[in-house]
């Protein structure tokens, strides 16, 4: 009721004539015009002009997986009307990284069950968050199965209590955080590199669409050449690609600068670019650290339970 009163006060009216404007999603215009045709009113529909774009409200429409990221996107800010919807790109990485950090079948099943029960209530205000928990629960179960973790080593500990002579020591696994730490670290940084390059690809395409071709070449394409050069050098193919990439960094960093600023721009681009990339990729090592920490904490928590039972049994 309060909202209706507020909307009424905002209408343009002189007591006899009422005029107002608003926005409607394009796919709903047919439904709107069908309703307005039944009313005693005149109306016009038009696409937003370039000047109006900053004022156009944003309605995100994604699939079930990407829609789950709405609760995170809305905490920061919605993209501009002519911008890029981050949800389809962010969702796979976010859900994948979450599952990688948790990596436990038991925790994942709890997340799946809790979110499923909540979604059965169909509360639209909280639905996005619970959908995110659901999909994160899926990847948590998957990574838990890959690492053989069910509430840590709870099952082997439980079986050991029931049958001290059992040979069951662990669930089958592809890798474990304690034994394959370096492999997980390399995998985490590789996934981080893929995410960063994906972001660069989106930036590259958007700059091309806006006609900022030189910016797209010097700020994104240049570093792709550098990365390709590093890969070629590591494989022992050739060093020429890397030299070309570094030359492009030097040329691109100073192409818009003037005078002595070209020199400082070159050194700044090389130093900030290389150290920045190294730091960004290295930061994904936290995925491995959190997976390892969760595994260790679970084992520490489960061990006293088994030890207490063993002492009681001996007594």
Task: Label each PLM-derived region with a short phrase.
Residues 1-90, 118, 123-133:
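Long, charged N-terminal accessory/stalk domains
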Residues 67-166, 172-202:
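Core alpha-helical transmembrane segments of integral membrane proteins
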Residues 25, 75-78, 82, 86, ...:
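Membrane-interface junctions
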Residues 17, 93-95, 285-287:
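Active-site lining segments that contact anionic ligands and/or coordinate catalytic metals
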Residues 143, 149-150, 155-307:
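Hard-cation-handling environments
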Residues 105-106, 283, 315:
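Amphipathic alpha-helical protein-protein interaction surfaces
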């Amino acid at each position: 009721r309060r909202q209706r009163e507020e909307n009424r006060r905002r209408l343009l009216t002189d007591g006899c004539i009422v005029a107002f404007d608003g926005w409607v999603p394009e796919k709903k215009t047919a439904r709107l015009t069908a309703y307005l045709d039944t009313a005693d009113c005149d109306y016009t529909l038009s696409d937003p002009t370039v000047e109006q774009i900053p004022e156009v409200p944003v309605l995100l429409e994604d699939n079930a997986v990407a829609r789950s990221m709405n609760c995170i996107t809305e905490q920061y800010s919605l993209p501009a009307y002519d911008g890029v919807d981050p949800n389809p790109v962010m969702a796979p990485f976010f859900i994948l990284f979450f599952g990688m950090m948790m990596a436990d079948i038991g925790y994942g099943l709890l997340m799946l069950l809790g979110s499923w029960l909540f979604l059965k209530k169909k509360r639209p205000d909280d639905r996005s968050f619970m959908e995110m928990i659901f999909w994160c629960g899926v990847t948590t179960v998957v990574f838990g199965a890959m690492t053989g973790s069910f509430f840590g080593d709870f099952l082997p500990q439980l079986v050991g209590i029931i049958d001290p002579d059992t040979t069951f020591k662990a669930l089958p696994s592809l890798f474990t955080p304690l034994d394959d730490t370096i492999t997980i670290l390399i995998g985490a940084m590789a996934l981080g590199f893929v995410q960063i390059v994906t972001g660069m690809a989106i930036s590259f395409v958007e700059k091309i669409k806006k006609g900022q071709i030189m910016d797209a070449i010097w700020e994104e394409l240049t570093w792709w050449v550098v990365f390709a050069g590093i890969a070629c050098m590591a494989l022992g193919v050739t060093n020429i690609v890397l030299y070309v990439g570094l030359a492009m960094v030097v040329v691109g960093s100073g192409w818009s600068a003037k005078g002595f600023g070209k020199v400082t721009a070159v050194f700044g681009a090389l130093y900030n670019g290389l150290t920045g990339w190294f730091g960004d990729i290295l930061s994904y090592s936290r995925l491995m650290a959190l997976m390892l920490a969760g595994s260790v904490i679970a084992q520490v928590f489960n061990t006293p339970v088994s030890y207490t039972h063993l002492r009681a049994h001996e007594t």
